């Protein structure tokens, strides 16, 4: 079977894009697919002998296996390629440093705020709980020197304050969790949509390069 190396790499990226990946990996794949769609001629140009582009050995070994197939069953070999293998291939692109790396960085930044917000919520929750504990301790101190009836009021106040803090922390944590899930979900939907259109690009590239 005759399959060009570039068509193989593009097909492998498309295959990985529809697999289960983390939010960060999804964002990076989205950036790569977007760059391929916008600069397909650059990628097709890699097929020339003077491009200087070399496929990493682990990816090349899978490509060599593909060449032994006589039908489309070779696509099952894509499962042998993981995200790291694709990353090692991408960083060898001539325009990785000048163009693609900044696009990937921007894509990763789009999913990082959710993680940052979650961390801030966790710190806020810890601070609130510490304040609640401190307040409860302070309220308990006067009860040892006061009459039993007077100690009940501070204790009740501390309990109410603790419940109020807990109540305020819960919605915040829930909101952040929902935001994180929505961010990952939206990123997944975007890359799936990109992968769908990218599939047509790969088919066209393969037709030109086979």
UniProtKB/Swiss-Prot annotation:
Induction: Induced during anaerobic growth and by cold shock and heat shock. Residues 122-186 are annotated as: Disordered. It is found in: Secreted, Cell wall; Membrane. Keywords: Cell wall, Glycoprotein, GPI-anchor, Hydrolase, Lipoprotein, Membrane, Secreted, Signal, Stress response. It comes from the Eukaryota. GO terms for molecular function: lipase activity; structural constituent of cell wall. It holds the Pfam family SRP1_TIP1. It is an enzyme of class 3 (hydrolase). Residues 1-19 form the signal peptide. InterPro entries: SRP1_TIP1, Yeast_SRP1/TIP1_CWP. One of its GO terms (biological process) is fungal-type cell wall organization. Extensively O-glycosylated. The GPI-anchor is attached to the protein in the endoplasmic reticulum and serves to target the protein to the cell surface. There, the glucosamine-inositol phospholipid moiety is cleaved off and the GPI-modified mannoprotein is covalently attached via its lipidless GPI glycan remnant to the 1,6-beta-glucan of the outer cell wall layer. It is a lipid-anchor; GPI-anchor. GO terms for cellular component: cell periphery; cytosol; extracellular region; fungal-type cell wall; side of membrane. Residues 187-210 form a propeptide. A lipid is attached at residue 186 (GPI-anchor amidated asparagine). Its EC number is 3.1.1.-. Seems to have esterase activity. Prefers ester of fatty acids from 4 to 16 carbon atoms. Present with 35600 molecules/cell in log phase SD medium. Belongs to the SRP1/TIP1 family. This is Temperature shock-inducible protein 1. It comes from Saccharomyces cerevisiae (strain ATCC 204508 / S288c).
